[in-house]
Amino acid sequence: QSYTRYMVYGDNEGIGRRGYRVGTPLRIALANDFFRPIQGTYGVMELQPGQVNWGSINPQPLPGAVRLWMWSVFAGGSDFICTYRYRQPLYGTEQYHYGIVGTDGVTVTPGGYEYAQFIKEIKGLRGKTEARDVKPADYMARRTAILFNHENSWSISRQKQNRTWDTFAHIE
């Protein structure tokens, strides 16, 4: 199982004066809970490494935001994170969509430095902990869940019973 997460693309305000440069923190927490399987591996197949070019507003993530997102993903139990792209392209429709390195293929971007810092930090933690192949018994014994269906949510959003309805706000 995997999901993609683009936190800063201009369509949400986040929290606080500069929240639009960090995104709404519940987006990662909800995705972790939604996609986490009872057994097996899951993670983020595409995590935004920097500015995108397809949003209504395309802000740079705040310094530290990419690293914050990575810690949030792993804190939710994910097993892996992949960045959307390694290198920012020279041309094309996503020419201004950042990668881990810039257009020259060598210069590390701010998001690339945050990936490197996170990798160093997670390696340091691995030396202080013992990996578990089996999930804890108390976790496996849980019997509570949120039943959610994207198609139902999309249908409700297109035909709201009132203009204030927000499915995600309801389940958060």
Give residue ranges: language-model regions.
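Carbohydrate-binding surfaces of carbohydrate-active enzymes
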Residues: 3-172
